[in-house]
């Protein structure tokens, strides 16, 4: 009797341990009984998205938390696959779905943070919810932002600057400082192709301004002569040193390499300018993209919760109502686009568990992955400079275009701190004729 009981208890214990061990390997989505009590497992089983495949269940059925064999991965297909749910991808997915019957799949490498206070609370940008040992901003947190490092900068002690990109549904609009800045028209008129000149796109800036409110009362702010003159000196020195100053030149000065002219003492400059007169470098339009709640608090308003919120997409990424032909798949890092000849036929991506998935494409693939990752995906897919792609081992070369991944121009925005004391401070601030040495 004692031997039998000992054996029975051992067997029960052995089966229980096997079940618990298997739970870490089986990804089956048991919706029939979420706590697994029918198998003697009292801890909740983690629910996963339905598109996530189940790993091989090679143990006996009675040891698996799911009472039936694991399903095969579903076959994904769409008319249009959009890669990247950032500022462009969210808008594109919304309007394509709203005004067509096309089946759309939107792939995003980051997570959906609609209920994450780190994203939704405007103060989350400054690290309000960080633990004490993580004194970093959201854009410095790899859970919310890509952290690609540039090549060493010989002009900055060979440091490798990091240019953060949003890693979330909403892209960088989910992690930025909530300032809206109207660009200077010179950049668009001098450097952008036909159809993208400032007057061509000005109407879109006007639409944005109609939808948001400035953080300050009124539309204008006083600036001192000292600030204006100091900035003009910086621009003049940049010109004399041969440094491009495209973003310091503006319409108001007739193309001269300085910023707004001073007049009538301290001038009044319109910061809410969509004519492109004000300089990107000199002035910011201090708009804050927020929604005020009934209790007086604010939440971040960004591309994700504006175009893909719960009115249009459910918590599992499936579209609702008119948007039922849209599917948003987050935590999906795109591997590459596959071609037959020069026609895109599928997109493969890797989920957060390392499983590889394929999406069949009937019409188009739209890459909305930003200025860094769009060329990266193209190159991995065999589109780019063949000599370079061959050197890094890209297997299938599709289209030879040496310009892919070249010609990036970024508005570099370093922070310079200067410490002066006594008479030097007054001279530094008042001697605008000579200006600071840079």
UniProtKB/Swiss-Prot annotation:
<comment type="similarity">
    <text>Belongs to the GMC oxidoreductase family.</text>
</comment>
<keyword id="KW-0274">FAD</keyword>
<dbReference type="InterPro" id="IPR012132">
    <property type="entry name" value="GMC_OxRdtase"/>
</dbReference>
<protein>
    <recommendedName>
        <fullName>Putative truncated GMC-type inactive oxidoreductase L894</fullName>
    </recommendedName>
</protein>
<dbReference type="Pfam" id="PF00732">
    <property type="entry name" value="GMC_oxred_N"/>
</dbReference>
<dbReference type="GO" id="GO:0050660">
    <property type="term" value="F:flavin adenine dinucleotide binding"/>
</dbReference>
<keyword id="KW-0946">Virion</keyword>
<dbReference type="GO" id="GO:0044423">
    <property type="term" value="C:virion component"/>
</dbReference>
<dbReference type="InterPro" id="IPR000172">
    <property type="entry name" value="GMC_OxRdtase_N"/>
</dbReference>
<keyword id="KW-0285">Flavoprotein</keyword>
<feature type="signal peptide">
    <location>
        <begin position="1"/>
        <end position="26"/>
    </location>
</feature>
<dbReference type="InterPro" id="IPR036188">
    <property type="entry name" value="FAD/NAD-bd_sf"/>
</dbReference>
<keyword id="KW-0732">Signal</keyword>
<dbReference type="GO" id="GO:0016614">
    <property type="term" value="F:oxidoreductase activity, acting on CH-OH group of donors"/>
</dbReference>
<feature type="binding site">
    <location>
        <begin position="79"/>
        <end position="109"/>
    </location>
    <ligand>
        <name>FAD</name>
    </ligand>
</feature>
């Amino acid at each position: 009797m004692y031997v039998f009981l000992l054996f029975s208890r051992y067997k029960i214990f052995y089966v229980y341990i096997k079940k618990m061990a298997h739970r870490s390997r089986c990804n089956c989505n048991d919706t029939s009984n979420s706590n697994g009590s029918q198998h003697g497992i009292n801890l909740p089983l983690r629910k996963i998205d339905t598109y996530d495949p189940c790993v091989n269940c090679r143990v006996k059925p009675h040891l698996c938390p799911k009472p039936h064999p694991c399903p095969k991965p579903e076959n994904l297909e769409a008319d249009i696959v959009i890669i990247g749910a950032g500022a462009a991808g969210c808008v594109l997915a919304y309007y394509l779905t709203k005004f067509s019957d096309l089946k759309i799949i939107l792939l995003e490498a980051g997570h959906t943070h609609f209920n994450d206070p780190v994203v939704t609370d405007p103060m989350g940008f400054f690290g309000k919810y960080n633990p004490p040992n993580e004194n970093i901003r959201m854009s410095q947190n790899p859970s919310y932002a890509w952290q690609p490092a540039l090549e060493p900068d010989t002009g900055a002690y060979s440091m490798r600057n990091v240019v953060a990109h949003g890693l979330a549904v909403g892209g960088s609009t989910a992690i930025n400082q909530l300032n809206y800045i109207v660009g200077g028209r010179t950049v668009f008129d001098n450097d952008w192709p036909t159809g993208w000149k400032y007057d061509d796109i000005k109407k879109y800036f006007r639409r944005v301004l109609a939808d948001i409110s400035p953080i300050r009362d009124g539309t204008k702010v006083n600036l001192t002569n000292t600030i204006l003159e100091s900035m003009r000196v910086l621009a003049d020195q940049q010109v004399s040193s041969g440094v491009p100053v495209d973003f310091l030149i503006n319409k108001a000065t007739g193309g001269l390499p300085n910023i707004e002219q001073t007049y009538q003492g301290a001038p009044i400059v319109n910061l809410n300018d969509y004519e492109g007169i004000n300089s990107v470098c000199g002035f910011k339009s201090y708009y804050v993209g927020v929604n005020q709640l009934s209790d007086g608090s604010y939440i971040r308003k960004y591309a994700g919760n504006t175009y893909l919120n719960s009115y249009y997409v459910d918590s599992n990424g499936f579209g609702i109502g008119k948007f039922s032909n849209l599917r948003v798949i987050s935590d999906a890092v795109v591997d590459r686009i596959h071609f037959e000849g020069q026609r895109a036929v599928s997109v493969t991506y890797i989920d957060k568990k390392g499983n590889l998935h394929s999406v069949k494409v009937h019409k188009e693939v739209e890459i909305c992955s930003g200025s860094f990752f769009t060329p990266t995906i193209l190159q991995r897919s065999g589109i780019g400079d063949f000599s370079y792609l061959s050197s890094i081992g890209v297997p299938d070369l599709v289209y030879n275009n040496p310009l892919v991944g070249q010609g990036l121009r970024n508005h570099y925005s370093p922070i310079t701190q200067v410490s002066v004391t006594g008479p030097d401070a007054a001279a530094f601030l008042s001697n605008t004729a000579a200006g600071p040495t840079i």
